[in-house]
């Protein structure tokens, strides 16, 4: 349930109208997180032309404009089986599963010829500087958040993915890593930004580094701190032992079967998923031996990691300097905009319209409070188990 109108006094059409709804309230809660605001704000500017500029859960203010028809049509288009990827894992006959899916799912739909895909972001010709506002916690009224981010190569090329992970690990893996050390020891901020690191879950990789607890108008100094650290590494070189230890740790992490809170088969499926949805070979991403062998060969070249830093970061114009600026009235301004939107949407409601809102609210409450019939639950007997 996305959103609905409801009177503050559910039986009084003279009382104030409010917005209710599971999705609306969930996303208001989710977007109250400063880290979420930082990530979605950064993404909106870094991915200004592609699908990743949108908040996948829904911007609370925009949720108010969606209609039931909008939702149904979007679902029919984007969640059609023709746009799905089906995985099987384990010592089972895939033909049997595929026949089951065909009979019970695919046969219920007409094939769709529309091919949906995520386009690569249009690349910037020059870096951007952008800022937004957030509501600070008590005591943090002067804390600015500054993040410098770069859009890199595609995430489903196994060699490029691993070498970018290696670059990131060398720079940020622990407090002795050069870029993390520079951030943690800087007086410009209190601590590294929670967005610091490599984001590999989208079609194109994002590398970010920054600080929280920064003073006003220090965003350029934060960028200079990061860029100067990177340039120093390029000019002075990265110690071989740091590269070797980072590569060793990366190999262990990539090969280790940890469970990670989920079955190993599901881990494999999720690893393959980006290549599947972006029309690449999913088995390539699992070929770790070949990818690591290529990287080890490249590491025999002089300044291999330094050249990666130079290409991916120093000479990369798709760079964003993004700040979140504290504003103690930010939440109130948001609430005022939502209130004004509600007022504009409801100012022409008739008395019949208002009574219908009361009737619908009562019907929903009755349904929500109804006791579920346990007979509706399926029963499994011993005879059902093969």
Question: What residues fall within each predicted segment?
Answer:
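Non-catalytic beta-strand/loop surface segments
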Residues: 13-17, 21, 27-83, 103, ...
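Helix N-cap motif at beta-to-alpha junctions
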Residues: 90-95, 215-217
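Extended, domain-scale alpha-helical bundle/helix-rich regions
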Residues: 287, 294-341
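Conserved short loop/turn motifs at secondary-structure junctions
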Residues: 2-12, 27, 59-60, 85-93
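Short cationic amphipathic helices and targeting signals
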Residues: 84-91, 208-212, 320-323
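Extended, regular secondary-structure scaffolds
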Residues: 74, 85, 93-113, 236, ...
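Long, charge-rich alpha-helical interaction segments
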Residues: 272-277, 282-289
């Amino acid at each position: 349930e996305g959103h609905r109108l409801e009177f503050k006094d559910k039986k009084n059409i003279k009382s104030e109208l409010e917005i209710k709804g599971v999705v609306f309230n969930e996303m208001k809660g989710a977007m109250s997180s400063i880290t979420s605001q930082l990530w979605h704000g950064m993404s909106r500017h870094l991915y200004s032309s592609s699908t990743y500029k949108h908040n996948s859960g829904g911007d609370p203010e925009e949720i108010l404009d969606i209609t039931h028809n909008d939702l149904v049509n979007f679902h029919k288009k984007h969640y059609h089986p023709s746009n799905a990827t089906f995985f099987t894992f384990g010592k089972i006959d895939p033909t049997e599963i595929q026949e089951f899916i065909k009979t019970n799912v695919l046969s219920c739909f007409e094939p769709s010829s529309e091919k949906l895909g995520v386009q690569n972001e249009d690349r910037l010709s020059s870096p951007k500087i952008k800022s937004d506002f957030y509501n600070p916690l008590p005591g943090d009224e002067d804390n600015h958040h500054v993040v410098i981010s770069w859009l890199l190569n595609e995430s489903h090329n196994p060699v490029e993915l691993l070498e970018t992970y290696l670059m990131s690990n060398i720079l940020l893996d622990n407090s002795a890593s050069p870029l993390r050390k520079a951030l943690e020891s800087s007086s410009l901020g209190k601590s590294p930004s929670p967005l610091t690191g490599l984001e590999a879950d989208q079609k194109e990789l994002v590398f970010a580094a920054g600080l929280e607890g920064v003073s006003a108008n220090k965003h350029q100094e934060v960028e200079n701190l990061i860029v100067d650290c990177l340039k120093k590494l390029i000019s002075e070189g990265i110690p071989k032992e740091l590269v070797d230890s980072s590569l060793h740790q990366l190999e262990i992490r990539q090969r280790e079967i940890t469970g990670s809170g989920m079955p190993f088969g599901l881990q494999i499926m999720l690893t393959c998923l980006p290549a599947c949805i972006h029309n690449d070979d999913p088995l390539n991403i699992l070929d770790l031996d070949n990818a690591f062998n290529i990287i080890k060969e490249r590491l025999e070249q002089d300044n291999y990691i330094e050249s990666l830093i130079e290409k991916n970061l120093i000479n990369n114009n798709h760079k964003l300097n993004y700040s979140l600026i504290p504003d103690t009235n930010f939440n109130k301004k948001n609430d005022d905009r939502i209130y004004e939107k509600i007022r504009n949407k409801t100012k022409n409601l008739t008395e019949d319209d208002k009574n219908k809102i009361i009737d619908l609210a009562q019907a929903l409450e009755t349904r929500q409070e109804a006791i579920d019939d346990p007979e509706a639950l399926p029963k499994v007997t011993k005879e059902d188990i093969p």
